[in-house]
Design a protein with these regions (language model features):
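Short, structured beta-strand/loop micro-motifs enriched in basic residues and often containing a Trp
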Residues: 1-6
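Short nucleic-acid-contacting surface segments enriched for D/E, G, S/T with interspersed K/R
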Residues: 8-22, 155
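Acidic-basic catalytic patches of nuclease active cores, encompassing PD-(D/E)XK
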Residues: 12, 45-96, 115
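Flexible glycine-rich surface loops and low-complexity tracts that mediate binding to linear polymers
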Residues: 17-29, 33, 206-207
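Residues at the starts of beta-strands that form the adenosine-phosphate
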Residues: 20, 120, 163-165, 201
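Conserved catalytic cores of phosphodiester-cleaving nucleases, focusing on short active-site segments
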Residues: 105-141, 154
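Nucleic-acid nuclease catalytic cores
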Residues: 135-145, 155-184, 206
Length: 222
């Protein structure tokens, strides 16, 4: 059976022969493929030194007693779960797909400062992280010129009075932060450092993952 993989990345460390995957049946009977691949189990059978892993990841894997970890690889899921999460926060305005400059960002937000009463304008770009190496998340897993462009324009927006946020949705449990994948796309790593230096905030959105759900459970701001 041929299925559609709902991810534009490579996922080569996940989609290996013999791995367990989870499918979702399409509601479109006219599609070439009947199913979408939305999640995959990664095995950790041959880890000999769990001491190299971050504490949070070791705790999630019970110091190696757990042998598999579920990854959500649906590239459409991050924006959906972020929207649901944003609705539970104290934003007065939430606009998906907002155009600024030559880019379209995932969200435009407004929040009223409880002290000053002023309205804070926020641009947010969402990126899903599905690459984990030794308990740490990395992005991207394939070159993304669009991602570089977004970072540059997030930096520009700060000069025009916006707060700019890059939000990584971590699509596996136990991982608490995401680093730039220098080996795969050094330009993205450079752009990210410049963006952070200009004032762009980086948020790590930690998730609970099941076979058919993805839910934000914690947030780290950097």
């Amino acid at each position: 059976e041929t299925v559609h993989v709902k991810n534009t990345g490579r996922c080569k460390e996940l989609l290996i022969p013999g791995c367990n995957v989870y499918l979702e049946k399409s509601e479109n009977p006219n599609r070439k493929t009947l199913y979408d691949l939305i999640a995959v189990e990664k095995r950790y059978d041959e880890i000999f030194d769990w001491g190299i892993f971050p504490l949070a990841f070791r705790k999630r894997m019970n110091d190696g007693k757990e042998k598999t970890l579920l990854f959500n690889i649906d590239s459409q899921a991050p924006n959906k779960v972020v929207l649901e999460w944003l609705k539970k926060q104290d934003y007065s305005v939430i606009k998906p797909e907002f155009t600024f400059g030559k880019s379209r960002f995932d969200f435009y937000l407004e929040k009223i400062d409880s002290v000053t009463g002023k309205t804070e304008k926020i641009l947010m770009e969402v990126k899903g992280c599905t690459l984990e190496i030794e308990g740490v998340g990395y992005f991207p897993d394939a070159p993304t010129e669009r991602g570089v462009k977004h970072l540059n324009e997030l930096s520009d927006a700060i000069g025009e009075g916006y707060k700019s946020v890059l939000a990584f949705v971590i699509q596996m449990e136990g991982v608490t932060e995401v680093f730039p994948n220098v080996k795969t796309h050094p330009e993205f790593a450079t752009a990210l450092e410049k963006a952070k230096a200009s004032g762009v905030e980086v948020w790590f959105l930690q998730c609970g993952v099941t076979e058919d759900t993805l839910e934000i459970v914690d947030v780290n701001n950097h």
